Amino acid sequence: LFHYCQCQCPPGFKGKFCQFKLRPP
C-alpha cells in the first residue's frame, strides 16, 4: 500500500497520508 501510494502521490505527500487518500479499490 505504501509503495503504491508513494508512486501515485506527489513527493509533497507522505506515505501515510497517500495511503488514505489514494487507497486502492
UniProtKB/Swiss-Prot annotation:
Expressed by the venom duct. The keyword Oxidoreductase does not apply. InterPro entries: EGF-like_dom (IPR000742). Changing residue 7 to Q: In HT1-0; increase in affinity for melanocortin receptors MC1R, MC3R, and MC4R and 4-fold decrease in affinity for MC5R. Contains 2 disulfide bonds. However, cysteine pairing is not critical for peptide binding to melanocortin receptors, since peptides with different pairings have similar potency at the receptors tested. Changing residue 18 to Q: In HT1-0; increase in affinity for melanocortin receptors MC1R, MC3R, and MC4R and 4-fold decrease in affinity for MC5R. It is found in: Secreted. GO terms for cellular component: extracellular region. SUPFAM superfamilies: EGF/Laminin. Keywords: Disulfide bond, G-protein coupled receptor impairing toxin, Secreted, Toxin. GO terms for molecular function: toxin activity. The cysteine framework is XIV (C-C-C-C). Many analogs have been synthesized. Among them, the linear peptide Hunger-Toxin (HT1-0) shows an increased affinity for human melanocortin receptors MC1R (200 nM), MC3R (40 nM), and MC4R (15 nM), and a decreased affinity for MC5R (200 nM). This analog also binds to type-2 angiotensin II receptor (AGTR2), but has no effect on type-1 angiotensin II receptor (AGTR1), vasopressin 2 receptor (V2R), and the five muscarinic receptors (CHRM1-CHRM5). Peptide with nanomolar affinity for human melanocortin receptors. The natural disulfide pairing being unknown, the activity of all three possible peptides (with the cysteine pairings 'bead (I-II, III-IV), 'globular' (I-III, II-IV), and 'ribbon' (I-IV, II-III)) have been tested. All three isomers show similar affinities on each human melanocortin subtype (MC1R (~500 nM), MC3R (~100 nM), MC4R (~50 nM), and MC5R (~50 nM)). This is NU-conotoxin-Ltg1a. It comes from Conus litoglyphus (Lithograph cone).
